[in-house]
């Protein structure tokens, strides 16, 4: 029996464009914040890393909090759309603040300014916006194929935006003057673009009525869960923990790739290569995303596709290490592209996997916590990205790197090589290991069989994939 379709092509594109706004924040922050702070503002990489790590302690609480708030929200716009729409206003303001540290401030005041603006951006506004955006996957359609398509559209926009930001920002900043004020100007422009696109995205989709989401019956207040109860439901779901772990590892990987700006500048002696490597990463990802929905259908699920993709990614990153020690930039780019091609399918279908994870909680616990379930996206992105950026700072500080110096010691150059060549390979191996155990689709099929639920009835009956 063919599943009911809920979305037009423009709904899918409109939804996907929301990650343009998300990556205006995320790609800009993770790729360039550290180099701005160390080389333009003159702050110590190790201290910045420590402040970021401390900020992450706050994030774990806010992810579960906002997920729980979305589950409790009832408005004319729906459950998630208000949080997505209004949360980005704060994102835009605090993004500018992160790149607008007053040069007249003393060192301590500069650290304080950064810590406050960074914590508000990640722990409050980006959290509210990103969890709501991700939760829409479960709230605007009950069709499993459409959910995979939404994920593909979303990450095509995400990686296209990441590609553009990584490719043009260095030159853009130089054209604006190359100093701290230039970074502020670029941040303002990016924030405005993100705000406009996020608004368009939020208004391009409509959440399904609660009557339809809940099998014709609106949940009463007794079905609302407190944050503590929602947290308990999450940790009982082993697949949620796996997805969180994978997200964190992905963002650690991304932070090391972002640290490539140091590797290109000091080891390869050409900072403009950072933009060229961005093409080698993002174009294959986009190509893989285009074919992900077809491959999911061909292989009758996401598990085999994701695992095989990451086997390819590990091979690609291992060859990048070899090419790096050979000193061959063309080979490094080619193998970087191979690794990215393997990573693409998981990027495209992860939201559908999370929907299956939410279904697993419903089947095992009899309770639905869609908004809170999608906290793993924001939690993983922020904790992984934040810790990754912090680790970059700590490792640079440990190696003796000083951003304002004209030359760097050999220990710093060796550390940059380790961060850019070896750590991404290690993280890919760990992700492959986790994905080998993330067969939530089969687990759900077994549970449905035990409960006597027909496979073709589940989407409509359970509101999830």
Question: Where in the sequence are the language-model features?
Answer:
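Membrane-embedded alpha-helical bundles of multi-pass transporters/translocases
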Residues: 2-465
